[in-house]
Amino acid sequence: MHLMYFTEQPMSAYPEDAVGEDGTTALLFSNEHFDSVAGSRLYNERLIEYRLAEEVGFDGIMLNEHHDAPFCMQAQITVWASVLAAATERIKIVLLGTPLPTLDNPLQAAESLAMVDMISKGRLVAGIVRGSGTEQYANNVNPAFNRERFYEAHDLLVKAWTEPGPWRWEGPNYEFRVVNPWATPLQKPHPRIWVPGVASPETIVWCAQQRYPYVCLNTTIEMTKQIWELYEKSANEAGYESGPEHRGYLLRVHVQDTEEKAIANAREYMWMQGEFTGLGHPVWSSPTGYGSPANREPTLKRINQRADAPQAMPFEEQLEHLQIVAGTPDQVVERLRVLLEETRPGILALWGNDGKVSHEDSKRCIELMGSDVLPALREIGDELDLRDPFEVGAPLSTQFMEAPRIPEGAPA
């Protein structure tokens, strides 16, 4: 089982009384409230924590990207990826992911990701995403073309990595007279591609058709099972049998020496949930054209005041339903066993620290995960035969039916 560490890198150093009446801080909360000293401290503390995650035995560090909001300080995912490529030695650098449809020039992503893969000596997982509705506004992109731009940018990215140039690209959204990137990834034919999401049926089906792992982002156990059912059905229709190596799961998990302290820190996830989801503006989160009509219906009802806005599940209920797992190492392992037995992912990302959890508590959480939780999870993974794509040598994709390889003579 592939075990990753994740944090949104949220920034809480702003005057909360400056937030508008609707409570949202995404997109239109003025950056006059940004504190660059606090921002510098945050980045450097996160780097210490990432290095610690490698030291204690995590297999990967998961990174993501958001814009114009304090809930996520990762505005450029490839910047952090390049930092980790140089600052770490062993751990996989897992991007979940590069928001392809927001890019007017996907070839720049192809080049920068290739550089990260070479600097890291082949440790990149080049995950891709559509980007949330809010990201379309932040990047000045028409949301109506998001999905088709996602598919086309993906095809262009893969071709740029694998087909020698120069050649011309003429598509409905992108046109390039010359495609001939000199730098291509170290991994051949290209790095693995994983796709995260929150249950969009179209994306799940597409992932299964491509043989890409789909990583569920903190979905409920029941929703996760429904996702796997759709993935498995789509995989069967594509002519193969899916397994744990195609299933990923991101879950909020916080560990401390005492249950009392773990629960107190885990309550900070609710601050994060308010920043990100509970107070997300419905118009910005789901702009016209971004989602399918069926997926957009609940949002339209809220906008037109024909339905109440969804409220975050109370903290205690999230603990009960394993949406949040917090406690001592033994308590956390016991609860994660239930989740692993129910959902059977080969890829598990532990969303360890967020909100206003201190740097020292974050480090202690990572240390306890490494000493007690990760070894127990590996034993459970072996017991349940939860193999990840690297362990089974899973095919890269439907297009490339082999595992990525690092050429002979590459630096060790």
Model-inferred region functions:
Residues 1-91, 189-191, 388-392, 403-412:
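N-terminal beta1-alpha1-beta2 module of alpha/beta enzyme domains
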Residues 60-80, 100, 137, 219, ...:
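Glycine-rich, proline-tolerant flexible connector loops at the mouths of alpha/beta enzymes
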Residues 199-223, 227-228, 232:
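A conserved active-site cap/scaffold subdomain adjacent to cofactor or substrate pockets
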Residues 4-34, 147-182, 223-345, 374, ...:
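An alpha-helical appendage that flanks or caps ligand/catalytic pockets
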Residues 28-44, 97-107, 189-199, 253-256, ...:
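Active-site mouth loops of central-metabolism enzymes
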Residues 3-7, 61-63, 93-96, 124-128, ...:
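Hydrophobic faces of well-ordered beta-strands that scaffold small-molecule active sites
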